[in-house]
Amino acid sequence: MSRRAKMISKIKELMYQPEYIRNIGIVAHIDHGKTTLSDNLLAGAGMISAELAGDQRFLDFDEQEQARGITIDAANVSMVHSYEGNEYLINLIDTPGHVDFGGDVTRAMRAVDGAVVVVCAVEGIMPQTETVLRQALKENVRPVLFINKVDRLINELKLDASELQERFVKIIANANKLIKNMAPEEFRDKWQVRVEDGSVAFGSAYHNWAINVPIMQETGINFNDIYKYCTEDNQKELAQKVPLHQVLLGMVVEHLPSPAESQAYRVPIIWSGDLESEEGQAMLKTDPEGPLAVMVTDVSIDKHAGEVATGRVYGGAIEKGSEVFLVGSHSKARVQQVGVYMGPERVNTDKVPAGNIVAITGAKNAVAGETICDTGRKIKAFEGLEHISEPVVTVAVEAKNTKDLPKLIEVLRQVGKEDPTVRVEINEETGEHLISGMGELHLEIIAYRINEKGVEIETSEPIVVYRETVAGTAGPVEGKSPNKHNRFYIEIEPVEASVMQAIQEGKIKEGRVKGKEMAKNFIEAGMDKEEARRVWDVYEKNLFINMTRGIQYLDEIKELLMDGFESAMDNGPVAKEKVMGVKIKLMDAKIHEDAVHRGPAQVLPAIRKGIFGAMMSAEPVLLEPIQKVFINVPQDYMGSATREIQNRRGQIVNMTQEGDMVTVESTVPVAEMFGFAGDIRSATEGRCLWSTENAGFERLPNELQHTITREVRTRKGLSPEPYRADHYLG
């Protein structure tokens, strides 16, 4: 029996023993060494040859990833590790650290129970480390810490043993501070990472060695020895004595929970159904015999198998050939194959039980975030996947050859499925198709993928996505239907800052409000009690509130009014950009008694005109997307770096110094960030590290409001000036 065949049969056996399974993610800031670490873990588990590990980038099996040397998608792999006489199945997901691909991290965190947080010893905890750790803790995923690139502290920064320990203490304290602030209350102390219990390891992923306290006690190797091995350039011997995979996978087995343990406290957070029901109990107990519950975290397109959905089985078992129900798309599908991952390969089996990460082919219509269950037992969907930032940059895409148009549309739909953080707008009338993403790099990669699928495209210069809102209040104004028989009286004001924050943090859910149970959340967020009880719809951070009393026929057109409100919020009156942070209050209404005269053709234009008229009367303004920019630069170049920021309408928020390095923290409008990579590199002669994080939207400065409005409108083929309020209210 070949080694590979042995591995496969072992994986198939361990799948049924949840207490011997560990589902883990590796998360870090870009270039802190995640993929190198994953490769060496695989080599240790006998999945790829040891010589190639680190250069092979086994999990970066996309051409673009290998060319750019960064991870773009989250890749999956399963392996077997022996620890203290038992064998464990470890399902590993390598996630991207670049801010443009944060959506993949969010989705991977839903599939795992534990995370190895990799921090570069030289750079310490960076902004993206905080973001990914925050995402992990929000999903109740337990962390352990691996401090990587320790050899560089010794050989490049020439730190001695006591300075090394000082540096480590600082990194660990920072990590624990984040865990204390973000972990669920009952785990704040339990999940602290500690050197003494072995939940912190130190090492070099590139040179394939690691140590933690239990291994030091076992092997007798201490920090002074490490110091010696590194300065004498003898890390190969070190890697034989304390191989990376043994230390890290041992730490994973020892400190990170099995599905059997974690589902008991994770399910209540990610599934809001009845925990006492049969489905609820099956998930809490990781029961392979219970009703089926799978959460899809990712969809990719395979040349041979078509769409492959990756997900986590929380309850029951998913079987080849069975018919399943997709809760989100309300459709049935027949499962063609199920299996687990070994690197980029899928190994098919007959069924995959609760507690495992599964690859499913045949689940047509599945998208990331979909819930799959048995056809006979429809369950409540899992909570939506909330990604921390939203798309801020758009490019227009056209096919080079007109004959490719139909194919382009199909490929764009696929891209939207594969990566839910991309927003795709297909306009078959004008032939202009828009893709919005998290940043320049994100969109470059997507354009490359479209070309790879056989459609040659041309893309426009990147365009920034703006938002519309109001700075003042107005109303009541009257919106009339075309037949003049229906009238709606509307008031408008900005949404309270505290309510905006509650929506952003997910304390207030988006969607049409059913019943009164949401009122409590609105009141807690600081909203007026009367208004809180009357919210009908929360849409894209806007509120629609019915303040009327006893209006006849209002209930019969309630859904139409919300449709009209939502379509108005999708294309605002200033520049046909999305609206955010606006509170629309319906104060009064006159509605025709005859249903024929109050259909969609009458109600929709009336409510839209009323909303647009109110917005144009309430000091409408554009908001622009902002990014936080972190630059780590030698002191001599600090002046050049800050000048780069200030020339881009940026603001310096904070500066900290460590040794001769300075970290500059600033905020810069996304519109000014194009071409920043090249400019900052030349300004600092390549001696800087920088990263960005999306920081929401802020009001565009007054002197730019008019120019940008005209630019956006002209680009969209509209008249340069927006209509005034009386155009809508006349």
Curated annotation (Swiss-Prot):
Keyword entries, A-Z: Cytoplasm, Elongation factor, GTP-binding, Nucleotide-binding, Protein biosynthesis
PROSITE patterns assigned: G_TR_1 (PS00301), G_TR_2 (PS51722)
Chain positions recorded as GTP binding sites: 28-35, 94-98, 148-151
InterPro entries in the cross-refs: EFG_II (IPR041095), EFG_III/V (IPR035647), EFG_V-like (IPR000640), EFTu-like_2 (IPR004161), G_TR_CS (IPR031157), P-loop_NTPase (IPR027417), Ribosomal_Su5_D2-typ_SF (IPR020568), Ribsml_uS5_D2-typ_fold_subgr (IPR014721)
Modified residues (Diphthamide): H597
Compartments it resides in: Cytoplasm
SMART domains: EFG_C, EFG_IV
Disulfide bond annotation, renumbered to this chain: none
Start and end residues of each tr-type G domain: 19-260
A molecular function (GO) term: translation elongation factor activity
Gene Ontology CC annotation, any one: ribonucleoprotein complex
Family statement: Belongs to the TRAFAC class translation factor GTPase superfamily. Classic translation factor GTPase family. EF-G/EF-2 subfamily.
Function: Catalyzes the GTP-dependent ribosomal translocation step during translation elongation. During this step, the ribosome changes from the pre-translocational (PRE) to the post-translocational (POST) state as the newly formed A-site-bound peptidyl-tRNA and P-site-bound deacylated tRNA move to the P and E sites, respectively. Catalyzes the coordinated movement of the two tRNA molecules, the mRNA and conformational changes in the ribosome.
PANTHER family xref list: ELONGATION FACTOR-LIKE GTPASE 1, TRANSLATION ELONGATION FACTOR-RELATED
Name of protein: Elongation factor 2
Organism expressing this protein natively: Methanothermobacter thermautotrophicus (strain ATCC 29096 / DSM 1053 / JCM 10044 / NBRC 100330 / Delta H) (Methanobacterium thermoautotrophicum)
